[in-house]
Amino acid sequence: MTRPGARTLGILCACLVLLGAGVFAGVRWARDWQGSVTLLANWSGDEREQFEERVIEPFEEEYRIDVVYQGSSALSQVLAADIAAGNPPDVAVLPGPGELLAYAVDDRLHPLDGLFDPGHYDRFWAPEVTVPGEAPHTYWLPVKTGLKSMVWYTGQRPTVQSAASPNRWCLGMESGATSGWPGTDWVEDILLQQAGPRVYEEWANGRLPWTDDAVRKAWTTWADMVGAGAGERVEQALTTGFGADCAPGRLEHQGSFRAGHWRQAGGDHVHFSEVVPGAGPDAGAWEVSGDLAAVLNPTPEAERLIRYLADPGTALPEYTANRAAKADGEQDPTEREIGAVLREPGRARCWDASDAMPRTTRDAFHQAVLRHFAAPEELDERLAELERLREEQDLPVCGTD
């Protein structure tokens, strides 16, 4: 018997793969679709698979609406290009309200009034926003949320004193097109714990100068805590991905998305205020993040998707801000605690400030922390550059509802 050669087997495998893809495409084409909706977001890998499995596939099955998903790590650039070309997605999911506010002011977003109950959310998650010439409207809905202001550790619980050495910290600043955001998280969180939510909200809304003493103190505190300007350490952190594993005994200032990693390491977390030098009397508020869905093309299919995302019975990935949703029974104690902080009334929560800022300011902030980390002696120049970009706006950045 003659055995097939490697080339023959390779061709056969390729044909089978193409046949399988064709069958899958044929199955999707043969479905009795009642319409379609385009969705732009930045989820990829496991995050995208989880969203498709828990949200998109059940939605398609129930409503016979084909969700055409477009994922991109350069989300802001792709969306801006699509809008400029006159071909925006029906629904876009962006990480924060600052960029969405600009699109609302430019009359690019369509109100979500009547599609869901904003009372199921803290006001700052799904606020009524007033744009020039319009009555107040709700323009976005939180799809998934994350908790920040967390310090992960193993072993002994950290304190201000034990966290004072830069060598204690695990730090990765690289994140592709958005490199620098781990550093902005530090500066923001330090300001929140040192100066409190009121000052923080004024700053995030462009009503407090970047050159203010409280803001400057946050930058210098961060530089001291992480060893800014130390050549080898700086080079390592600038080229290390934000999700890289930490060496044993290190501390990590990262959000709830790292819970799985630290659970496997046998770790725990403390609130960031416990390790920040100079934490003020209003310390203890939580910095939070979220992916927000907005409608750019108000088709019936797009509105149906928004209703589905707001339904308390929809199994959204990770953490929902919807107070009417039932707690996920499969979550471990740490995950349940995180979910409670994100949803329960009475908790002081503030948006990640850079995500609440206009896009130009946010991007400049990312670059400024990278440059400050490498050359902390040039702080005056960095703050002056950011001050020239400061724009006042009116967003509910903090809340306790």
What is the predicted role of each segment?
Residues 97-149:
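Hinge/lid segment of periplasmic solute-binding proteins
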Residues 139-143, 162-208:
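Extracytoplasmic/periplasmic solute-binding protein
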Residues 180, 201-237:
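Glycine-centered hinge/linker elements that transmit conformational signals in sensory
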Residues 221, 226-301:
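Extracytoplasmic/periplasmic substrate-binding proteins
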Residues 286-360:
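Mature extracytoplasmic/periplasmic domains
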